[in-house]
Every structure is written in structure tokens, then in C-alpha cells.
Amino acid sequence: MTDLALIRNFSIIAHIDHGKSTLADRLIQYTGGLTEREMSEQVLDNMDIEKERGITIKAQTVRLDYTGKDGKTYQLNLMDTPGHVDFAYEVSRSLAACEGALLVVDAAQGVEAQTLANVYQSIEHDHEIVPVINKIDLPAAEPEKVKAEIEDVIGLDASNAVLTSAKSGIGIEEVLDAVVERIPPPKGDRSAPLKAMLVDSWYDPYLGVVILVRVIDGVIRKGLQVKFMAGGTEHLIDRVGCMRPKIETLDELGPGEIGFITAQIKEVAQARVGDTITTVKQGASEALPGFKEVQPVVFCGIFPVDAADFEKLRESIAKLRLNDASFSFEMESSAALGFGFRCGFLGLLHLEIIQERLSREYDLDLITTAPSVVYRIQLRASRNDDAREILLHNPADYPDPSRIETIEEPWIKGTIYTPDEYLGSVLKLCQDRRGIQTGLTYVGGRAQVTYELPLNEVVFDFYDRLKSISRGYASFDYEQVGLREGDLVKMSILVNNEPVDALSMIVHRSAAEARGRHMCERLKDLIPRHLFKIPIQAAIGGKVVARETISAMRKDVTAKCYGGDITRKKKLLEKQKKGKARMREYGNVSIPQEAFIAALRMGEE
């Protein structure tokens, strides 16, 4: 058992690429967590995608032993948290498990938008925040300027910020000393009923679900019968341990400690992040605050390119779900794309990661339909149905427009950091996306803009456009601010007067015409010509808002007539005309798969 005064629980907050995982690697190396030979880049990022993109998706933990200046050995529990907005709830639970945080800022780039969001969460948890200025050995490093920025933007005293270079190992000891001296020890009562917070969980093929816990009060040990208070399930603990970063089995975890437990749980969905774990007998009476069900925000359809891969896709999605309970799916079928799944995600990065893992780990070729958000629709009463409220995930399920009383869509509050010279383009982009500006401040040579935007406009291609107009310099972060009423309509795309379900979308009435025209032009270039004219239309209800026509290929039926009578030619041309009219009525237009994929990738405008 470790004395509470010798425990320090801390997390690392940083924007993508500011050196968070590298700093964690150095701390592990310095405290002897791994030998030189076992050390690899980004030890705590287990997934290939995490390493390649330089992002952290799942929260990871590692226990380090460090002998301080006073000669005592401290137990340091480092939580490596995700930095991206999609995983904001995971971050909030990881932060709630700690008493302090290292704020890592790149000495050359300064404070970025994502750093801010997580710092404010950390401040809400009353954390002691230690600023760490990283990459000080870069030629472009300006530590003094960054210190001033931390003070101006975040309002933290950065006079005693630790200067480090995680890559070359400068200042690592100073970071560890700062953790020991400046971050407070946890509080807890060993004799009280067990109360532990479930910080994260993941699936291990040998152990079942591994659960990361922070013990608040009481003791957790092997053989205990515990219950999850929000989930309501009971389990018998069969292993207790910690990561150093290799798995080490322990007898027990006491108050203030962070470690893992296994209890032969088969699905991650049973172990919900933020839940409270207590004993079945004489357990805690009330759960820890802050638990909430994670709801998917962005939805899209995922279909196999080859219909024969459907079963493989079903198995792969089910396996991914074992490890990621925040991702939901149900079967759907489309006339154009066959069988597939309607999947829900926490945000766009989450969608991209799942899609990439499906294609990479399970070797699947996939088509994803345009992402959409959840709309709340109030329906009027009809002759055979009462007035009611529905949630709409899929544009194909859009109800009869005459019954719709109101439609509400989710809005977000976005914070954008951008260098001055790109400010005009950024403001124009936000206005084009129906944004409402709520603030504009200048920090050094950069502007911080806050906008309220409909999430529907952001999921489409907002992030890519923002990066391209600012040459990659702008950073963006958002939080949800609830639902608001909007003038939204369903736009259907008709090819040869037949609606194509996979291409229908919900858009704001003001943007419908432009979006419809763009889609029709796109399809005109992609669908091959047939022997008859093909109209492509974008329609809202019965009203066509945009139209393009693919002209017919012409077969020269008069080629076999040599000179002679004009009436013979007229007769043949008349016959051809009738045939084409009949074809137009009964002919099927085959839309090639590539046309679908290209039309759905409208982001490349």
C-alpha cells in the first residue's frame, strides 16, 4: 500500500503534434519504465493509426516510480489523454481521475485551439496546471513569446514554466520534480465503502475487457464482487494490476491509485466510461458525479463496394464495437448500394478512424455516404397518427413534409485560431456556412474567432476548407450548444425521373439550389451517355431546383440509304424517334459505382 502523500496523478494536455506522446516516452525512459531495447516511439499509442497520424485516441495510463529531491520514492500515475474534440468526454473522465496536468505547448507554434478546450476542462476540475514549453531546441523556438501567450490567452502564470525538449531529453528531470512539488497528492479514505471511477476500457483477446480505474475511496482487490452503478451489472474481479507500461499484477489498489481490473466481461459496452464501481455488499450509496451516456453525433451509411463482402463487413464492425462502445450501427439497405450499415460516430475524426480501421485491419473496400447529423422533428397529428417527436438519423427516412411542424438541428460553438492574413477568408467561410460571429480577439500575431455554426455545415468539409484557405495554419475546436430550429428541407436527386436514395440529403433552404446544381453538374460528368436523353434533377418535394441533361448518343439509321427517296429517310428517322421515346420511358440508367463514390465525395469542391 502506498501512502497517499507519495502519490501524484497527472495528465498531459497538448494540441496535436506538440510533443505529448514523446514527452510521455521520455518520462517512462527516465524513470526506468522500459529498457533502451524495449523503448519504441510513442509507447502509449498502441494503434497503428495513432502512431501514423500522431494522435492519441484511447486514454492510456502508466505508473512510474521516481525518487524525488527529498529522497522519497513517489508513485506517479500518468494519464495520456486524447487531444481531439471528438473524444472530449473521454478527456473529461481522464482529467477527473487526476489532480493536476502538464500543459505542453510547442515553443515554435504557441497555444492552439484544442489546447484551450482541454485546459478549460482541467481548470474546471480545479487542477494544478504546470506549463511545459517543449521543443526549445528548434531554431524557430520562442519560449518567452510562448510564455506571454500562455499568460494572455489562458491566464496561467507561466513565469516558472518548465523548458524542455522531449526529443533530445532536455529538462525531463525538471518536469518530474515539478510534478512532485507542484501537483497535490490525492485524497481518499481507505476504510470507506469502495468507490472507483471507470476511466476507460478496452478489449483484450486473452483477458476480455480490461477496465482502467481510479480508486477514490476503499480498496479494490481480486475476488471482490463489484457492481457498476450506472450499468447495473455485477462482476467478480479476477485480476488487479497496473501498467508500467508492461502489465504488472498487484494484490490491491488503494485510494488515490490508478490501475486496471479484469472481470471476465465480454463487451466494452457494459463498462461505460465515467461509471462508478462499488462493492455489492455495503457499497457506496451514491455514484460519482459527471457520468453521462455518450451519444453519437454524426451518422453515415457504410456499404461494401463488393456486395459479397457484406458478411465480412458485419463481422468487422461487430469486432470494432467490442473495443469502442461510443460507435453504434444498424443494418440498412439502399436501392443503389445494396446492403450496408448506418453507423453513428462521436464526430468526423472518429468516423475517419473507424473507416480507416475497417479498410486497413479487415481489408475491406467501402463506400461511405455523405455524413449527416441528428435532427429533431415535431410532427403534427394526422388522421391516423398522433402528434409526436421523432429523431431523424437518415435523410431517406424523412417524413411527409406536410406533417412537419418544426425541424431542429444541432449547433456548435467553434473557436478558430488563425494568423491575421487569413482572417478575411476564415470569416467568409464561416458566414457561407450560416455562422453567427460571437467574438474576435487578437493574441500576438493571431486572431481568435468564435462562431456559432450548424453542425450540419461543419461535418461536410468545413475542416478541410479551413485548412486549405489558411494553408494549414488555422486550428479549430468546437463544443455542442444544443438544438435550434432551422428552415431545413430534404433534397432528392432524380436520375431519369427516379430518386436515388443514397444521394438524398437534408440542407438549408437557402443553400439547396447551389448544392443541387453542383451535384447535378457532378453527376452529368460521371454518368456515361445512353441511347436516350437522361435528365438529372435536384428536387425539394415536387419542386425542381436544378437540372442538367445528358444528351443521347445518336446512331445513324440513314447510313444504309443511298440517294433516292427522302420519304424513306424520314420513315427511318421517325421510327428511331419512337424507339427513343419508348426507351426513355422504360430504359434503365445504370449509374456506375465510381460515379456514386465521386458524387458522395463532394468535399473536393
Swiss-Prot record:
tr-type G domain location: 5-187
Keywords attached to this entry: Cell inner membrane, Cell membrane, GTP-binding, Hydrolase, Membrane, Nucleotide-binding, Protein biosynthesis
UniProt EC number: 3.6.5.n1
Reactions catalysed according to its record: GTP + H2O = GDP + phosphate + H(+)
Cellular compartments per GO CC: plasma membrane
GO biological process: positive regulation of translation
Protein localization: Cell inner membrane
Protein name: Elongation factor 4
Organism: Novosphingobium aromaticivorans (strain ATCC 700278 / DSM 12444 / CCUG 56034 / CIP 105152 / NBRC 16084 / F199)
